């Protein structure tokens, strides 16, 4: 196999990895290193005095061969990136003949072997992960859309807490849609060079992906903040708090994503904006996410503390305790699901722990929207009751509007009445 084809084959085998990891392209590090080596080699060759004797310095696509005299053998080690596949360091020789450089001996595939069977298994693994997260996001979109329809269509379910849930559902739909858009824009062809590919659509898809991810984290945090406010206050202003959450939950992601896009356009408009591993501007996106994860985890611990105190028998009647529990149980199932997960990985480098991170964040994580829809809608007793009433002809929408508002959405002064079974 020709040395150029051998190098290209290795990179093609690695190409499924960026499809799964999104913004991490390890093969681009290899290509970038080769391009730098080629540039240095050609520059050194130009600086060497011209001579008709021997063989000039040359770049063969993988290694830079220095100037050599006629009849001289030159031995060079395999390119550095081959060390990722084998601990044994190979070497390649070339003879400077009267007609020029000879072919490398032994050939690159022999001197610099790559375990293609292992790479084929990894390719199959990454393809399987992609299938799993595609199925997971698809199921989540359907479930979330149904959940939003239910919460919007049934007026007796209208209350600030369910409004917050609806916003969270929407962010999961956006996040899943952004994944599909990014896959379509960046990985529509196996021949795409991810290291130099640059179109308006691919940049928009990457920016949309970052925005959707930030909104998802911000509304996960909003869920924790809102529940903290309800549990900690005896007379919470639910609707006013909701509109503050709307402003922060959507406004901050717009601000940070817009700032990141501006920095990319002005200072780092290269490739498809997804080579963020060493970019300082990546922290405009990652920094707020890491901070929100830490705050969310702290709020989770505070919620547990409040619930333990409020659920003590001495604190109130069994009826009040039941109301607190019914209010918080779905959120308590959700916050640990995300908090523990992200508290482990978000403070680590992006390429750390990929063996565990891939199946959790991409595989299991793609079903998170589906899980949220189940916890906050389909298993919610009040939602099931309202659906049952409409199904059996007892339409709650036929009740007078003033009765519906007074019973279901208007908070009273009493903490026990504020934390109703519905909101």
Curated annotation (Swiss-Prot):
Cytoplasmic side: which ranges? 152-167, 232-240, 305-331, 379-423
State the disulfide connectivity: 41-64, 55-96, 78-112
| Tissue specificity | Pituitary gland.
Residues annotated as signal peptide: 1-22
PROSITE patterns xrefs: G_PROTEIN_RECEP_F2_1, G_PROTEIN_RECEP_F2_2, G_PROTEIN_RECEP_F2_3, G_PROTEIN_RECEP_F2_4
Which cellular components does GO assign to this protein? Answer: cell surface; cytoplasm; membrane; nuclear inner membrane; nuclear matrix; nuclear outer membrane; plasma membrane; sarcolemma
User: Where found?
Assistant: Cell membrane
Q: Which family does it belong to?
A: Belongs to the G-protein coupled receptor 2 family.
UniProt name for this protein: Growth hormone-releasing hormone receptor
* Organism of origin: Homo sapiens
